[in-house]
């Protein structure tokens, strides 16, 4: 490719509305342009990178035994009604009617469509297992699209769906896909972690996320210092440290009219926050207990995913408002506590070990000091309610926990029969009876992978692609003063022809621009190998090679250049 024949839309300045580095660099490198909130045009440089990522995914999926198909973006509403997700999904699901007033959705995912397809196409257990995938556009009507393509409304996703006769067969394919994903993200050159994860709106019995480590990530990833344990913070078990100590002081009621929060309480009475307890009131799961108290240490954060798994807590978790609390308990939010509490309570493991702690007295303007379980109040049911923190023991008993930010780029699920049972997707079993198929699903956010790679691999000059395989061009030829030097032009043209013949993805910068502009643009878009051709160097029989990743510059004999590139460049 020649720059004179290419849409080379680089920007010198960073757009003001781009918050994260990947969004900034994708705009500056001419990869994307916004067309509406969360919607982007992909320009030639971006499309080249996107297609290269897709090809790596496609190659590894095919090696793993998956078969590529293509399903429509527009999906009939009745399939979503059949699975019950029409009501469950919420406003992220874009719904519309055609001219015949038939309801449709723009697909955020394709479980319903694939289940419908397979139940129509398969009839016998002999046709299973089967693993089908597509690389297709998705649409989720995000309330706040942000961070460029990291959280956009329209995006490209690889989604695969496997069908089985037994859970054991699903487990086998799940393990194959687990390894396929490892190969994909390793080939992409990403620093990633595989973590246990919540199944969320997709549902199912087990799932793993593939998280690219980056400070701009939206997820907290927990992992051990001494083992392979890793989990999304939503699922990481919080192990209580230490042992319960005996009471040392009598419980005392104190006036605290201006201490409605833990922070105010700690500041006014010079307390250690670790000695305080907070009481959160949430909606209950049944009419006999419409409100439930969740009791945590003052410095700990409620884990809503864990809490809503308790049978007394409504799912999804919802906090009671102040009026409900006042009507049921007779006290303002800032003065809630476990002593004389009139509703069922669940205590976090860490709180269960506390002694001589401080909490609201369930009387406005008052707190109790030196509360102790069993002596002052019966210990309620104990449950893991909190997020882990750095330094907690690893749940597997090996090492302590660290927490880093991550970008979720892949997610695999064991769906079981969630969709197949709801949609009556059966085949004839070995015994001749209808058999409900067991399912798995496996997703990769292709557009998000591009952004995640940039978040991990960049410098002050631009993008540094982690592998030649996904760079927009592998080699850039930068001839200095090409139109003033016949020798420079001739060598550049011949090198371009030779590399093209070898199948190298090469770009020749034949613009009438200053060398500094050409260097800056090639570094900005992340071309990993740059050949700089100057008249004086040619007279000495040399050209300059520059490596984008290391910044190293090397003078190479011009008659050895092709051999050098063959050794160091992946076509």
UniProtKB/Swiss-Prot annotation:
Gene3D superfamilies: Anticodon-binding domain, Bira Bifunctional Protein, Domain 2, YbaK/aminoacyl-tRNA synthetase-associated domain. Homodimer. Keywords: Aminoacyl-tRNA synthetase, ATP-binding, Cytoplasm, Ligase, Nucleotide-binding, Protein biosynthesis. This is Proline--tRNA ligase. It is found in: Cytoplasm. Pfam families: HGTP_anticodon, tRNA-synt_2b, tRNA_edit. Its EC number is 6.1.1.15. GO terms for molecular function: aminoacyl-tRNA deacylase activity; ATP binding; proline-tRNA ligase activity. GO terms for cellular component: cytosol. Consists of three domains: the N-terminal catalytic domain, the editing domain and the C-terminal anticodon-binding domain. InterPro entries: aa-tRNA-synt_IIb, aa-tRNA-synth_II, aa-tRNA-synth_II/BPL/LPL, Anticodon-bd, Anticodon-bd_dom_sf, Pro-tRNA-ligase_IIa, Pro-tRNA-synth_IIa_bac-type, Pro-tRNA-Synthase_IIa_type1. Belongs to the class-II aminoacyl-tRNA synthetase family. ProS type 1 subfamily. The lineage of its organism: Bacteria, Pseudomonadati, Pseudomonadota, Gammaproteobacteria, Pasteurellales. It catalyses: tRNA(Pro) + L-proline + ATP = L-prolyl-tRNA(Pro) + AMP + diphosphate. It comes from the Bacteria. Catalyzes the attachment of proline to tRNA(Pro) in a two-step reaction: proline is first activated by ATP to form Pro-AMP and then transferred to the acceptor end of tRNA(Pro). As ProRS can inadvertently accommodate and process non-cognate amino acids such as alanine and cysteine, to avoid such errors it has two additional distinct editing activities against alanine. One activity is designated as 'pretransfer' editing and involves the tRNA(Pro)-independent hydrolysis of activated Ala-AMP. One of its GO terms (biological process) is prolyl-tRNA aminoacylation. HAMAP family: Pro_tRNA_synth_type1. It comes from Haemophilus ducreyi (strain 35000HP / ATCC 700724). The gene is proS.
């Amino acid at each position: 490719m020649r720059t004179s024949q290419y849409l080379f839309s680089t920007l010198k300045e960073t757009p003001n509305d781009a918050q994260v580095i990947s969004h900034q660099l994708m705009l500056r490198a001419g990869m994307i342009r916004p067309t509406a909130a969360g919607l982007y045009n992909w320009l030639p440089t971006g499309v080249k990178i996107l297609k290269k990522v897709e090809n790596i995914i496609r190659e590894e999926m095919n090696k793993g035994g998956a078969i590529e198909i293509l399903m429509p973006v527009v999906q009939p509403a009745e399939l979503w009604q059949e699975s019950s997700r029409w009501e469950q999904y919420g406003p992220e699901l874009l719904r519309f009617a055609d001219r015949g007033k038939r309801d449709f959705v723009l697909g955020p995912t394709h479980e319903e469509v694939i289940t419908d397809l397979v139940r129509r196409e398969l009839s016998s257990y002999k046709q299973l297992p089967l693993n089908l995938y597509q690389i297709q556009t998705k649409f989720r009507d995000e309330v706040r699209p942000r961070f460029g393509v990291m959280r956009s409304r329209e995006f490209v996703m690889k989604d695969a769906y496997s069908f089985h006769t037994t859970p054991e067969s699903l487990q086998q394919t799940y393990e194959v896909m687990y390894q396929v994903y490892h190969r994909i993200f390793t080939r992409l050159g990403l620093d990633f972690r595989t973590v246990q994860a919540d199944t969320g709106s997709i549902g199912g019995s087990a799932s793993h996320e593939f998280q690219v480590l980056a400070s701009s990530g939206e997820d907290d990833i927990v992992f051990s210092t001494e083992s392979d344990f890793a989990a999304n913070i939503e699922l990481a078990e919080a192990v209580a440290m230490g042992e319960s100590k005996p009471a040392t002081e009598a419980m005392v009621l104190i006036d605290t009219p201006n201490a409605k929060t833990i922070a105010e309480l700690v500041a006014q009475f010079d307390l250690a926050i670790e000695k305080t307890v907070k009481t959160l009131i949430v909606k209950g799961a049944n009419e006999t207990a419409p409100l439930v108290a969740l009791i945590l240490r003052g410095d700990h954060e409620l884990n809503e995913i864990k809490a809503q798994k308790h049978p007394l807590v409504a799912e999804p978790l919802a906090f009671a408002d102040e009026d409900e609390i006042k009507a049921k308990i007779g006290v303002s939010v800032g003065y809630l506590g476990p002593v004389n509490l009139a509703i069922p309570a669940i205590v976090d493991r860490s709180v269960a070990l506390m002694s001589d702690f401080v909490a609201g007295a369930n009387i406005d303007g008052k707190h109790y000091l030196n509360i102790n379980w069993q002596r002052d109040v019966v210990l309620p049911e104990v449950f893991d309610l909190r997020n882990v923190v750095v330094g907690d023991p690893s749940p597997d008993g090996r090492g302590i926990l660290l927490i880093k930010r991550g970008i979720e780029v892949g997610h695999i699920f064991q769906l079981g029969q969630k969709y197949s049972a709801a949609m009556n997707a059966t085949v004839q079993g070995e015994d001749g009876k209808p058999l409900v198929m067991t399912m798995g699903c496996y997703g990769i956010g292709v557009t998000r992978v591009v952004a995640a790679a940039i978040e991990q691999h960049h410098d002050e000059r631009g993008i540094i692609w982690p592998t030649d395989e996904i760079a927009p061009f592998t080699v850039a030829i930068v001839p200095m003063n090409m139109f003033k030097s016949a020798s420079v032009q001739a060598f550049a043209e011949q090198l371009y022809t030779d590399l093209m013949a070898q199948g190298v993805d090469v770009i020749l910068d034949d613009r009438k621009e200053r060398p500094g502009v050409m260097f800056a643009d090639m570094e900005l878009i992340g071309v990993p190998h740059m050949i700089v051709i100057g008249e004086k160097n040619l007279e000495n029989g040399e050209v300059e090679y520059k490596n984008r990743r290391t910044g190293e510059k090397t003078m190479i004999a011009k008659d050895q250049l092709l051999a050098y590139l063959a050794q160091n460049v992946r076509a």
